[in-house]
Amino acid sequence: MLRQILSEMFIDPDLLAELSEEQKQILFYKMREEQIRRWKEREAAMERKESLPVKSRPKKENGKSVHWKLGADKQVWVWVMGEHHLDKPYDVLCDEILAEREHLRAAKDAELRKAQSLQFTNSLKVKSLNCDLQAVKKTEPQNVTRKAAAEEATDQGPRAIPTKKDDKAQTKDLTKKKDSEELKQTEDEKTKQIYKNWKEDSEWQASLRKSKAADEKRRSLAKQAREDYKRLSQRGRSGDGLQNPLTGPQKPKRPPLPPKPQFLQPLGSPPKSLGNQGVIRTKTSSTQEDIIRWFKEEQLPFRAGYQKNSDTIAPWFHGILTLKKANELLSTGMPGSFLIRVSEKIKGYALSYLSEEGCKHFLIDASANSYSFLGVDQLQHATLADLVEYHKEEPITSLGKELLLFPCGQQDKPPDYLELFQ
């Protein structure tokens, strides 16, 4: 299953929805590893095709190239924002970005108002010149009379009279200075008000909180997935039913086919033979038929669905169930209840688990003649029963602490796995 996903680099959205957050993180990590591996293969093939090593390639004139910075481990140097003690917190960065945006917006508004003010001042100057010309024309006769009177009074000595031009220039400078101060004060007040509105906006605050919570959750899940991956990598083969990942899964010798299974009856109902009972089957799609054929041909020889030391079907085993049906079966149980069902989407299994928060679903990879949770292929089990026994004491994930405590059995008859064993 994992091999198929990595070869196609695609996972069905419905199948992805069944994965837990931890399995999603591990799957994305695996897919990224596969992308890097393919990229390296293509680069090596291209270098061989060009038959020139990378270092000895002739450089073009004025050619540009990119060189990645390498860390102490000789790998590409990566800086994860927010994890270094010198990095600014997320909310501080948001505040600085918003303040910078509002400052730029206020500067643009100030330039626009300055241009409008300059245009208005120019229009006032034109009007003032027109008024002055009209006043000069009207006062020309009076100036002639005043000039004659001034010539007669030359004997009395010169007299300093303030001109109207000096008063006008002084008044104009004061007005311009006052307008400039008012404009600057208005810009500062507007910038502060816009920034205050942004800070007090409830929708923005809610969006910021959600973004921070999502970042924290992703960081926590990624960290937890890495810890689980490392923890399971260090275990190796440490008990019955486990396989060493370094040497690869050893293909077991197929045992003889088990006898006809002893079907478990629903709780509270008397034993009833199913030998002569007619079973009403619904029409199945080609995908479901392929899954049934796969189970009979490839899984029955490995005693899939059987209890570990008997020929009885395990109480936690179910047939092809939908996600909705699995949730309904678990809804009547208590936290720690679980069941393993044949997936309706792929050739594999899904473990449905009831926790305090609700139902969780983990895909089980059965593609390598062994059983392991999707992505965590370092710890593989020879049978489904071994996987269940192991996780009765060892949690599936360190974060969720999922222990398989109470198997969820059949609630209807005939059992939902009947078509798999016929």
Swiss-Prot record:
Pfam families referenced in this protein's UniProt entry, alphabetically: SH2 (PF00017)
Q: Which GO terms describe its cellular component?
A: cytoplasm; cytosol
Region Disordered: start-end pairs: 141-190, 202-282
Cite the SH2 domain residue spans from the record: 316-408
**A GO MF term:** phosphatase binding
Name the UniProt key words of this record, in alphabetical order: Cytoplasm, Phosphoprotein, SH2 domain
**Purpose of the protein:** Inhibits estrogen-induced cell proliferation by competing with PLCG for binding to ESR1, blocking the effect of estrogen on PLCG and repressing estrogen-induced proliferation. May play a role in T-cell development and function.
How this chain assembles, per its entry, is: Interacts with ESR1.
Q: What is this protein called?
A: SH2 domain-containing protein 4A
Species assigned in the record: Rattus norvegicus (Rat)
**What taxonomic ancestry is recorded?**
Eukaryota, Metazoa, Chordata, Craniata, Vertebrata
Q: Which gene encodes it?
A: Sh2d4a
